[in-house]
Curated annotation (Swiss-Prot):
Expressed by the skin glands. Transmembrane segments: none annotated. It comes from Hoplobatrachus occipitalis (African groove-crowned bullfrog). The keyword Disulfide bond applies. GO terms for cellular component: extracellular region. It is found in: Secreted. This is Tigerinin-4O. Signal peptide: none annotated.
Length: 11
């Protein structure tokens, strides 16, 4: 449920 821009990953 958390997304990070670099690298573009959501978990």
């Amino acid at each position: 449920r958390t997304c990070i821009p670099i690298p573009p990953v959501c978990f």
